[in-house]
Amino acid sequence: SLKNPLLAGGEGTNHSPSDSDFDADTFSSSTSASFTSNFAIGSIDTGSDSKSYSGYDYTLALTTSYNGDDSLEVELEAGNTSNLAELDLHQDGDGLRVGSISYTKPLGERLVIFFGDGAAGNKLYSTACVYSGVTNALDDCGNLNAAIDKEFGTAAGLSADLGNGFSAAIGLETQNTGTGIFTNESADAFGAQISYTGDNYGASVTWANIENTGAQAAGVLDTDEGATQSTAFNAYFAPDLNNFPSVSVGFESNHDDSSDLTDANDES
């Protein structure tokens, strides 16, 4: 065959070899792709370094549905913005690599489940935030830790439509290296969220328990045993008025229960 069905963008899966010019058992014709590239230049004043840096990131996101309701998502990414760490951009180098892969599937009319590797544990959350920006804290409307996105490795989650605009979700991440998943040696994170979405406003409460990891090695447990509990409150208002801005607000508090820390280490 001379045709490449990868980005055919058709509806549903291919069930008959006569329907298109590729084998019925090889690939779905419902795969789509999106491409994103960002360029940045700036500086971060750390008190000891305020030099200016530039960088970029690139994302290729592939989405496939096999029955019209499920979704297999693969994200390829590259970026060199490590000197601008406060930006919500890729920082792992110039080589294009698989950043995450996940599969999402509905269970009946009200439940949705997902699992994957490299994906965020908050994938099924409905955080009440309509602001979109480039920095980590502002882009998340202050929900920086409670909405789990630690890149530990294995991730899974479940969401439930409670009706009348209310929804609930749980998410988890766990280290997937030589220590095994959900063991005493692995770094684990789990959390939950309850949210409400109205016609032009919404609110959500998010909570998470994240085991502390070493500053230089994501997913490696800190030598000081403990975990950080985070709670975030978010809300937004998006009036249906021409030229009137939307408003998003958020507040998060964090408590580190490490044995050698005190309440003075609480942050918000």
What is the role of each PLM region?
Residues Y125-C129, A217, L261:
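Outer-membrane beta-barrel and related beta-rich outer-membrane complex signature
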